[in-house]
């Protein structure tokens, strides 16, 4: 196994660990889930570039008769990238004392101000940071509002 193969294995393991954490561990942390709301995806340009570059590497490895293990590892990396960028849906997970947004735990007492923009984006002002929450379904904003009002 070459250094390239080891690096590919490390990236695959890291992406797999992230996917397992995001799907199975994070919803079980910090108590029961009160509400999980799907969010809009951000631009997919980065993901297309990543998967495209991996496809170019696969093509280059196959045409130059590279090691088969490298080809399989590149295919696994492409599949993990496809899953994380296109299959997995980002979401905000509300718990009893806070919520997970972008895989970061934020307690409710850190929210200093909340606003709703004209285009349906919920803006939460924290101490030093502003969260822009773009929900997939506009009706979910009312569910979030009811949950936040009932928990305060």
Swiss-Prot record:
Residues spanning the signal sequence: none
Keyword terms, alphabetized: Cell inner membrane, Cell membrane, Membrane, Transmembrane, Transmembrane helix
GO cellular component term, pick one: plasma membrane
Superkingdom of source: Bacteria
Subcellular location: Cell inner membrane
InterPro entries associated with the record: DUF986 (IPR009328)
Ranges annotated as spanning the membrane: 6-26, 45-65, 67-87
Family stated for the protein in its record: Belongs to the UPF0266 family.
Organism: Citrobacter koseri (strain ATCC BAA-895 / CDC 4225-83 / SGSC4696)
Protein name: UPF0266 membrane protein CKO_01158
Topology versus the membrane: Multi-pass membrane protein
């Amino acid at each position: 196994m070459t250094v390239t193969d080891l690096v590919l294995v490390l990236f695959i393991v890291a992406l797999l660990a992230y996917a397992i954490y995001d799907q199975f561990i994070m919803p079980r942390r910090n108590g029961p889930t009160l509400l999980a709301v799907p969010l809009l995806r951000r631009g997919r340009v980065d993901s297309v570039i990543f998967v495209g570059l991996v496809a170019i590497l696969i093509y280059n490895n196959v045409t130059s008769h590279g090691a088969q293990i490298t080809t399989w590892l590149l295919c696994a990396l492409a599949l993990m990238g496809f899953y994380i960028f296109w299959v997995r849906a980002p979401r905000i997970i509300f718990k009893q004392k806070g919520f997970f947004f972008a895989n970061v735990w934020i307690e409710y007492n850190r929210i200093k101000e909340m606003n709703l923009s004209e285009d349906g984006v919920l803006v939460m002002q924290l101490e030093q940071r502003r969260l822009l929450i773009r929900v997939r379904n506009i009706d979910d904003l009312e569910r979030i509002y009811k949950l936040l009002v009932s928990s305060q």
